Amino acid sequence: MLTLASKLKRDDGVRGPRASNPASDSTRRVSVRDKLLVKEVAELEANLPCTCKVNFPDPNKLHYFQLTVIPDEGYYQGGKFQFEIEVPDAYNMVPPKVKCLTRIWHPNITETGEICLSLLREHSIDGTGWAPTRTLKDVVWGLNSLFTDLLNFDDPLNIEAAEHHLRDKEDFRNKVEDYIKRYAR
């Protein structure tokens, strides 16, 4: 089977140094992204948190993959949460697009899958947003941390969930457990 990594190695050997060609700018941008992804995916797989699994439906498309987070502590322990990660052509100048595919009761994730994680923001006033020095490993570790130390009730995206926690922590826990039973097994 031809993988993206072997194709890129083969293509570099055939083409040699690239000449400047305006017609190939968009192709070159995709190639830059794909070359970065070959390295980053290898690093990611070597440094994956023990509570995470990655799945590449097509090994030749490293720009699209799924992440499963299975928290082993806290409110979300026992759940299996699926995320879809799509890396745009302009990567690493812009962050990957991430969506939670599992319905969840969480202050930083909406029930429709939008995610509040500062490193996924293209522009951030506090300097914690996306930067070209960040990698897929940072994204995966950040998503994993949303279930533990980055769980943030003070700056929520899902205001209703955060207010629920503030009002009645035990009822919040019960609703989280109900969502896990219904949607995250």
Curated annotation (Swiss-Prot):
Pathway: Protein modification; protein neddylation
Gene Ontology terms: biological process: protein neddylation
Gene for this chain: UBE2F
Catalytic activity: [E1 NEDD8-activating enzyme]-S-[NEDD8 protein]-yl-L-cysteine + [E2 NEDD8-conjugating enzyme]-L-cysteine = [E1 NEDD8-activating enzyme]-L-cysteine + [E2 NEDD8-conjugating enzyme]-S-[NEDD8-protein]-yl-L-cysteine
Lineage: Eukaryota, Metazoa, Chordata, Craniata, Vertebrata
Active-site residues from the entry: C116
Region (Interaction with UBA3): 1-29
Keywords assigned by UniProt, alphabetized: ATP-binding, Nucleotide-binding, Transferase, Ubl conjugation pathway
Name assigned to this protein: NEDD8-conjugating enzyme UBE2F
Family in the record: Belongs to the ubiquitin-conjugating enzyme family. UBE2F subfamily.
Region annotation Disordered: where it falls in the sequence: 11-30
